């Protein structure tokens, strides 16, 4: 499993270094005069229950089908339970989905194809796939933008950019609290929260939240 490298300040240098080195089928039902056809939700919602509060994500299955399907596989398998936000840079992003509290990296599924050329942008509260310098290296790790990071959008400096596949629709205040936590170096890792911010569970909502 690979992770995005977010170096230290200055801010622009950090972004440029990052850039150097981040379908569900339609259900078929029997004909019935009373039962409408089942149509897959084009925008699944996922709740990340964290140690600092809940974050609800709306995923764009139409514009980022591979990334959404990949993320949902990790969600439905329980992969994210007990993982942490292991890299937090206020003004830039909060990254998670790959390490446990002991900073042990979890084994992942195979990497997926980059979908950054989908028109979605790395704006504040959007969620995107983390990766290395290889554009097609994204696995389980993701990041939530806490600033408008246009340098990460397609085509970026490497001709690809970082794939946005959804956005936060509830719990923005939780994201804001996470981005402000104290951080320190831990072994080879930088910008690690001093007190672990744990993803206690990740679940797909059966229906969209009433108020977004």
What spans do the regions from the language model cover?
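Cyclophilin-like peptidyl-prolyl cis-trans isomerases
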Residues: 2-19, 23-212
């Amino acid at each position: 499993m690979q992770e995005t490298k977010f170096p230290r300040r200055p801010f622009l240098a950090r972004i440029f270094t990052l850039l150097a080195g981040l379908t569900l089928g339609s259900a078929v039902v029997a004909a019935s005069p009373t039962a409408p056809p089942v149509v897959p939700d084009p925008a699944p919602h996922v709740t990340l229950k964290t140690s600092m509060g809940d974050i609800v994500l709306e995923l764009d299955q139409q514009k980022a089908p591979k990334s959404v399907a990949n993320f949902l596989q990790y969600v439905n398998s329980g992969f994210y339970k007990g993982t942490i936000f292991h890299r937090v840079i206020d003004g830039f992003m909060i990254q998670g989905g790959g390490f446990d509290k002991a900073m042990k990296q979890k084994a992942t599924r195979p990497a997926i194809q980059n979908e950054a050329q989908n028109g979605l942008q790395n704006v504040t509260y959007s969620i995107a796939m983390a990766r290395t310098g290889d554009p097609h290296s994204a696995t389980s790790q993701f990041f939530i933008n806490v600033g408008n990071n246009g340098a990460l959008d397609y085509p970026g400096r490497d001709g690809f950019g970082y794939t946005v596949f959804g956005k936060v629709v509830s719990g923005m205040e939780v994201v804001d609290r996470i981005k402000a936590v104290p951080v320190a170096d831990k072994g080879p890792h930088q910008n690690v929260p001093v007190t672990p911010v744990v993803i206690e569970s990740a679940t797909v909502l059966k229906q969209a939240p009433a108020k977004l």
